[in-house]
Amino acid sequence: MNSIEFPLFHRTTQNSVISTTLNDLSNWSRLSSLWPLLYGTSCCFIEFASLIGSRFDFDRYGLVPRSSPRQADLILTAGTVTMKMAPSLVRLYEQMPEPKYVIAMGACTITGGMFSTDSYSTVRGVDKLIPVDVYLPGCPPKPEAIIDAITKLRKKISREIYPDRIMSQRENRCFTTNHKFQVGHSIHTGNYDQGFLYQPPSTSEIPPETFFKYKSSVSSHELVN
């Protein structure tokens, strides 16, 4: 169900001696013992709590939840991230030892969700703060989807070369705590201009002769009726 293939791992000799590389051995040990730091702020985290039970049993993947970022190599963000929480999230990520990975779980974490449409304090995606390895959409995602995201992360770890990952993270640092806003005009004023549908001519634009002629014709029509 969750087998990870190594292209250089299945080389055997006549004496059944396994030969591999140090990079593949390191990848195998890391993907088999992921220690996640659970960063849940909303209802998506309740779905992740279902994995702890006997039905899904995420211990079989080697997942051991940790409460300290210095002992974790995977941070799983679930829920809305506000501007006030952003420095704390970045600090937790910086305190994690290398190599470290991020799973963004839920629509609120990936794009800000429904809270980002008319809110000045919501981060429009956690990838603006820390680099994300696996995106898990859903509102909320099911436990089966979380297992699939963990499986995809394990496959990604099995194929990576550790020095290349370190260099890419140093060159492509995409997180920052400096958020600049520009105050705009509110659109919820209650005054809605529908002139683009129909705009009758103003009385100030009509010549006086035409206006009085039209008014007298209307008055005579009302008298006849």
Curated annotation (Swiss-Prot):
One of its GO terms (cellular component) is chloroplast thylakoid membrane. Its cofactor is [4Fe-4S] cluster. One of its GO terms (molecular function) is quinone binding. Its EC number is 7.1.1.-. Keywords: 4Fe-4S, Chloroplast, Iron, Iron-sulfur, Membrane, Metal-binding, NAD, NADP, Plastid, Plastoquinone, Quinone, Thylakoid, Translocase, Transport. The keyword DNA repair does not apply. It is a peripheral membrane protein. SUPFAM superfamilies: HydA/Nqo6-like. It catalyses: a plastoquinone + NADH + (n+1) H(+)(in) = a plastoquinol + NAD(+) + n H(+)(out); a plastoquinone + NADPH + (n+1) H(+)(in) = a plastoquinol + NADP(+) + n H(+)(out). GO terms for biological process: photosynthesis, light reaction. NDH is composed of at least 16 different subunits, 5 of which are encoded in the nucleus. This is NAD(P)H-quinone oxidoreductase subunit K, chloroplastic. It comes from Helianthus annuus.
